From Swiss-Prot:
Region Disordered: start-end pairs: 61-84, 133-182
Main localization of the protein described in the UniProt heading: nucleus
Notes concerning its domains: The long N-terminal helix forms part of the 'assembly lobe' of the SAGA deubiquitination module.
Keywords: Activator, Chromatin regulator, Metal-binding, Nucleus, Transcription, Transcription regulation, Zinc, Zinc-finger
Lineage, uppermost ranks: Eukaryota, Metazoa, Ecdysozoa, Arthropoda, Hexapoda
GO BP terms: chromatin organization
Protein name (Swiss-Prot/TrEMBL): SAGA-associated factor 11 homolog
UniProt xrefs under Pfam families: Sgf11
GO cellular component: DUBm complex; SAGA complex
Gene name of this polypeptide: Sgf11
Subcellular location: Nucleus
């Protein structure tokens, strides 16, 4: 490999590189070739870079993002009304309403589950309330929840006797079954 091939030349030190550079730059023909080479390389790289960017923008659809959205021809008007922002949009939060399938009432979404539970009588207190209703309707009216007096004469036979009180059992540790000590 000779020095003039231009493929790869190694220099011993920096001083030798500087001497070789000065020797090439002292010749006007070599300077012109080097300047033309640098100029053409810069122009080629710039054109190729722009071509790749345009191609990529068209392929990915990001060309509109580079160009931006066209400006509106009419200027924005500032709206000064209650419950609206400066552009006229409503700024109040609208609660989502649900329709109760049981009573056909409109209930806020945040209250729908508790409403439905009470409306259908499925809540935790519903069994107590139902027991109270049964007791109240039994006391009022005919005396029988189901509406008939025909079973009243049979009730005296089995419910007339007083029940005997259970004797509480004492455990081996001296405490009663309900937890109280004797």
């Amino acid at each position: 490999m000779s020095e003039n091939d231009g493929i790869h030349i190694e220099y011993v030190d920096e001083q030798e590189l500087k001497r070789e550079f000065r020797r090439f730059m002292s010749d006007p023909e070599t300077r012109e070739k080097a300047a033309n080479y640098l100029y053409e390389s810069l122009v080629d790289e710039t054109i190729l870079g722009i071509a790749y960017e345009v191609h990529h923008a068209n392929k990915t659809g990001s060309g509109a993002a580079v160009e931006g959205e066209p400006e509106d021809s009419k200027p924005y008007t500032i709206v000064d009304q209650p419950d609206t922002d400066v552009f006229g949009s409503s700024n109040t939060k609208k609660a989502i309403d649900c329709h109760c399938p049981n009573c056909n009432r409109i209930v806020a979404a945040s209250r729908f589950a508790p409403h439905l539970e009470k409306c259908m009588g499925m809540g935790r207190n519903s069994s107590r309330i139902a027991s109270r209703r049964i007791a109240n309707t039994r006391d009022v009216g005919t005396g029988n929840y189901f509406g008939g007096d025909e079973d009243d004469e049979d009730d005296a036979d089995w419910s007339g006797e007083k029940r005997k009180k259970k004797i509480s059992q004492v455990r081996t540790n001296g405490s009663k079954k309900n937890g109280k000590t004797s």
